[in-house]
């Protein structure tokens, strides 16, 4: 009975009138569900182990979002925060479908600063709720995770305090979870209030983010090799900066540690099945854009093509593209089979493993998303 009431209350939260005045927003794609998930992450010195864990598990979290709603457009964002006097107070990374770009930004974050105990939690929440480009509309799923170990500075006169920010979040249809690293009592009091006012979950985890479970499978090596082949079908095009970004993504995928590489491949495989065979996130892959009908080959300027295509006659260009399309289709089909086998094996191994002594950051987030996205 209590569970039904809780779910009904949460559902009621999402259908309240949404207020957007004064806030940046994106426009929903007609007829397509949208799931937006942002993290407000403390990046002061004490959060180092958790941040490093987040870098390793961001792809499993992204996969959990896709698995909870396979038909949705997925957008993720991040607000990193420290305190006044540190290198930065907040650093905003906009909500985006380009998860590889978000991953690249996450890799650049380092845990530093935060000499006194409280941090600029109020400002960070305010930036996340009012400055990120949440999609406008009543049928959008918007979820925020506050992740930190220290309470907010309540003595900063210029800040909008968290109770008011959470009222704005409610008006905008943003559900707010509070993930507490460590066991500080003053933080717990605030984090519980944040979760209650935000209609989310209070989630306590160990200071280091908990034990991140990595299950090796017999399919991992082949998945990594196959992803390298798939990335070889990418043809960067467009302005020089865009081509450089695409090349960086394929190099970054190749350089990722094996556990990260396999989870990244799992997400990208799911994404390819949901799109026109896209194998990187974001713009700039000519093969994907031609297949999706977003681009025509004869409309691309020569100076926006890679050297391999620029020096080819028009007929040879088309033949080369067709070959890449066919190769990608075959490789993506093989990858989908391998990922399914890997997921099945990992699930069976997880069932056999002893229950962890404490929750971990990635499991806690995935568990919350599995419920909240389906409301």
Locations of regions flagged by a protein language model:
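Eukaryote-biased recognition of electropositive, low-complexity segments
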Residues: 162-166, 172-176, 184-291
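Bacterial N-terminal signal peptides
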Residues: 8-20
